[in-house]
Amino acid sequence: MKTYSQLKDTAQTRKDKKMTENAKKMLAEIQYPALQGTQDEVELAEKIRKAFIDYYMKKIDSHKAESYVDDQKKYASRCKKEARDVAEMKATIENFDEAALWIRYTGKQCFVERYSWDTVAQKEIDWKFFDLGDHIADYVQDGMSKEKVKKELRAIGML
């Protein structure tokens, strides 16, 4: 016969699993706008998108193992926040497709070429690349020309 503590642990495990599944489902349902560009550009943008989603999926899984997420409410809100972060990222970088194409344009495919997606999803993330994407997205929203963007990126040491 199981003790109260064992039964409680079993119930907790079921709740953890369900919440992780729900968070992943939310991630999977995020709708992205259709991509435009050459086939190479579209493939690159898709790879970048996939890397973001894979990274967040892994991040959700890893939270279960982290000791500071003992409180179930914190864990639940954390999972929801991760899914929300991806949705917000998609919203703030509506121009991320364009940013990805510009990364290709400026020859900054090193991220795609140097890192396997498994490595990216685990921990070896090239944050400089993500910063570059953010900077480009900001510049695109400000309506800068490609030449001006390249000049700005060189000035801050991104190119």
PLM feature segments, named:
Residues 1-159:
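Charged, low-complexity intrinsically disordered segments and flexible loops
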